[in-house]
């Protein structure tokens, strides 16, 4: 079974990188967005299981 798809929305690049590094260590699937507009596009096209803001 696949792990859930997580959308990480964070405008601060170092914080976003910290979150995604942690997710990679635990083999989670994730997408990133640096702003609300990109987050909406990613959410509508990929239908993530959870969104971290």
Predicted regions and their residues:
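Non-catalytic signal-transmission and effector/linker regions of two-component phosphorelay proteins
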Residues: 1-7
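Conserved Rossmann-like nucleotide-cofactor binding loop
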Residues: 14
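Redox-cofactor binding/interface segments in oxidoreductases and associated redox assembly factors
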Residues: 53
